[in-house]
Amino acid sequence: KIAELTGLPFASADDLFDATQNLDGFVTVSSSLKTCAVNLSKLCNDLRLLSSGPRTGFAEITLPPKQNGSSIMPGKINPVIPEVVSQVAFNIIGNDCTITMAAEAGQLELNAFEPVVFYNLFESIETLTSAVQTLTDNCILGITANEKHCEELVDASVGISTALCPT
């Protein structure tokens, strides 16, 4: 009936005993969400590093300003959106640990820890979805390259010597 009502391909588990005893399918989904969160946090770390500056740091890109910068560092833009997305990722990683431990905690024919699995799984799905949307709308779409500074870095790079001395 759920498949008919939603139009989604819901079906009973092939092995109902296994589905009652083990929550490995939920662990797999959670692990995939964790992997996505880890990669998203890594991307945010890269954005924070590449936008560090203005006088020191990489300063290769500029993030859209979303919060007042520092009073002691004029021109600094705080990378608040990448920071909040990384914090969401940390929470999803923690949720994955909770889901893993809950799946492991079942005994014999029953796992009584499904409520915490579902709570954390749904939270991870919802917060990851929101974090991606927030990062896209409030950061990614507004990033600008600091072309002049990047050109200066290329001109000063010792990597240019490779082009002058082909092997």
Language-model features, listed with the residues they occupy:
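Alpha-helical support elements that line or immediately flank enzyme active sites
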Residues: 30-42
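Structured DNA-binding interfaces in DNA transaction proteins
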Residues: 31, 49-52
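Glycine-rich, mobile lid/loop segments that gate access to catalytic sites or pores
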Residues: 1-16
